[in-house]
From Swiss-Prot:
Function: May act as an effector for ARL3.
Protein's UniProt keywords contain Glycosyltransferase: no
Protein name listed in UniProt: Cilia- and flagella-associated protein 36
Entries under PANTHER family matching the protein: CILIA- AND FLAGELLA-ASSOCIATED PROTEIN 36, PHOSPHODIESTERASE HL
Compartment(s) where it occurs, according to its Swiss-Prot or TrEMBL record: Nucleus; Cytoplasm; Cell projection, Cilium, Flagellum
Quaternary organization: Interacts with ARL3.
Gene that specifies this protein: Cfap36
């Protein structure tokens, strides 16, 4: 009994593998994946569009599998048992069953679609290169231009920061010197005012009030002078902002010119790339559709004589055991044929 069950599971696995290799499965699945993979990118965030496409894919897989299993006489329990058997755990079987597993696992589905999107882009670029000999400027020069501009921008920013730090340090040094000199000059009036208060309390106020006022006026004039100097220095320190970060002695140290056009240039290059690749990708997909349509037509034409012969030599209906035996023979013949061809 155990041997019979193992044989049955092996037969189910082999029949499903044969179906997944055939055109009835691979052509509609590949058409769907190639048409829908364009929106998939390698980001952690999953968009709502991804979920909708996954649901469409799941419905397509269920429809194809259901029609095949019904035709061959395999029920759902046998199918589940075959998918969980050790025969289905091998590397070859897992690669064949990946499109089926992707219908149930969104992570596998997304990885499959991202990989197909990258493959389609690389194929489009390869076709362009084979036809023209070289790639167009929009697919080669854009990255170099952006990197050069970024390097130039970093040089300018470093120079600006260095110059600004030097000017800031110089300004702070001037302030410290002025504060120390002002502190030294302010010490006598404090002493004089205290003396004036003491003498004023003793009754000689009129004699000392006049000197204190003179001292006050004198230091008021002194305090106006450093303020005027600070006002004169303001245009020098603010000139970087007013002149677009132009530093004296550095002709190239400016944020204008190519850096100002960085964002516009990058956007235009990316737009050209996207448009160019989309055109070639559409051509590639149309070529593949034509090839698959011819393949389906050829398989149908090859199948017609055998169907007519079967109808002409109609035999009584076979039993389930005879069907299984016949299917095993066919699968064995196909397997031997593949091994001979591969050798």
């Amino acid at each position: 009994m155990a041997a019979e069950e193992e044989d049955e599971v092996e037969w189910v696995v082999e029949s499903i593998a044969g179906f997944l290799r055939g055109p009835d499965w691979s052509i509609p699945i590949l058409d769907f994946v190639e048409q829908k993979c364009e929106v998939f990118d390698d980001e952690e965030e999953s968009k709502l569009t991804y979920t909708e496409i996954h649901q469409e894919y799941k419905e397509l897989v269920e429809k194809l599998l259901e029609s095949y299993l019904k035709e061959i006489g395999i029920n759902e329990d046998q199918f589940q048992e075959a998918c969980t058997s050790p025969l289905a755990k091998t590397r070859t079987s897992q690669a064949i069953l990946q499109p089926v597993l992707a219908a149930e696992d969104f992570t596998i589905f997304k990885a499959m679609m991202v990989q197909k999107n990258i493959e389609m882009q690389l194929q489009a670029i390869r076709i362009i290169q084979e036809r023209n000999g070289v790639l167009p400027d929009c697919l080669t020069d854009g990255a170099d231009v952006v990197s050069d501009l970024e390097q130039e921008e970093m040089k300018i920013l470093r120079e600006v920061l260095r110059k600004s730090k030097e000017e800031y340090d110089q300004e702070e040094e001037r302030k410290r010197k002025k504060q120390s000199s002002e502190g030294k000059m302010e010490e006598p009036p404090i002493y004089t005012s205290e003396t004036a208060k003491l003498t004023n309390s003793q009754g000689d106020g009129e004699h000392f009030v006049q000197p204190s006022s003179e001292v006050k006026v004198h230091f008021t004039n002194q305090s106006v002078q450093p303020l005027a100097r600070k006002m004169e220095l303001l245009p020098e320190t603010s000139s970087l902002t007013q002149k677009g970060l132009k530093i004296p002695g550095l002709e190239h140290a400016s944020m204008e010119g190519p850096i100002a056009n960085l964002s516009a240039l990058g956007t235009e290059e990316l737009r050209q790339r996207e448009h160019y690749l989309k055109q070639k990708r559409d051509k590639l997909m149309s070529m593949r559709k034509d090839m698959r349509a011819k393949q389906i037509q050829n398989t149908e034409q090859k199948g017609k004589p055998t169907r007519e012969a079967e109808e002409m030599t109609e035999k009584p209906e076979m039993t389930a055991e005879e069907k299984q035996t016949l299917l095993k023979r066919r699968l064995l013949a196909e397997k031997l044929k593949e091994e001979v061809i591969n050798k």
